[in-house]
Curated annotation (Swiss-Prot):
It catalyses: AMP + ATP = 2 ADP. It comes from Teredinibacter turnerae (strain ATCC 39867 / T7901). AMP binds at T31, R36, Q57, L58, V59, G85, F86, P87, R88, Q92, R156, R167. InterPro entries: Adenyl_kin_sub, Adenylat/UMP-CMP_kin, Adenylat_kinase_CS, Adenylate_kinase_lid-dom, P-loop_NTPase. GO terms for cellular component: cytoplasm. It comes from the Bacteria. This is Adenylate kinase. One of its GO terms (molecular function) is ATP binding.
Length: 217
């Protein structure tokens, strides 16, 4: 199964990605991981990427697509793969299509913005241990302090409401055109790529069942 998984930060995409990887025995592929691996491996493409990144430039879509094609030719992709965070833009999606990489299913884990803001801005963290609380859904026994150590909890910068809303705005700007692109592909070429939107709210097990059912498991 060759899957593209879309979802705003805080929608629970990472959790569902793990379930999909286990169910289909496929690797999760992100462009960041690919870039780092290529540089580390020292392949001709990796050397080119290293030079570009060292000069502070953005890696072009052409090189990203070459990296993708190189990565999905590896044995662990024999059963398929799960793209996470790629493609991010219409040009990347078009380049992926033109390069002959076939995608079977595009899935978006959809959660309303206000729910995501509530989820993320309510998180509190005990930095030393990594324990995570939520002011509403999983509060500490005593407000503002870790249950075990009694040390203060903090709100990460990434979880500040303004930051969350900014990240959501960027996601919508990038992803809504992608959703339309793949919906159009499905309408114009039935049987090639399927697009599904799954509501990412409710019990985790129910969301997992909806995701795997939509993918044919």
């Amino acid at each position: 199964m060759r899957i593209i998984l879309l979802g705003a930060p805080g929608a629970g995409k990472g959790t569902q990605a793990k379930f999909i990887m286990e169910a289909f025995e496929i690797p999760q592929i992100s462009t960041g991981d690919m870039l780092r691996a290529a540089v580390k491996a020292g392949s001709p493409l990796g050397v080119k990427v290293k030079d570009i990144m060292a000069s502070g430039q953005l890696v072009s879509d052409d090189i990203i697509i070459d990296l993708v094609k190189e990565r999905i030719s590896k044995p662990d992709c024999a059963n398929g793969f799960l793209f996470d965070g790629f493609p991010r833009t219409i040009p990347q999606a078009e380049a992926l299509t033109e390069s002959g990489v076939e995608i079977e299913h595009v899935m978006e884990i959809h959660v309303d913005d206000e729910e995501i803001v509530a989820r993320l801005s309510g998180r509190r963290v005990h930095e030393a241990s990594g324990r995570i609380y939520h002011v509403t859904h999983n509060p500490p026994k005593t407000e503002g302090v870790d249950d075990i150590t009694g040390e203060p909890l903090v709100q990460r910068d990434d979880d500040q409401e303004d930051t969350v809303r900014n990240r959501l705005s960027i996601y919508h700007d990038q992803t809504e055109p992608l959703v339309e692109y793949y919906q159009k592909q499905e309408a114009e070429n039935p049987g090639t790529v399927k697009f599904t939107r799954i509501a990412g709210v409710g019990p985790l097990a129910e969301i997992k069942d909806k995701v795997l059912s939509a993918l044919g498991k």
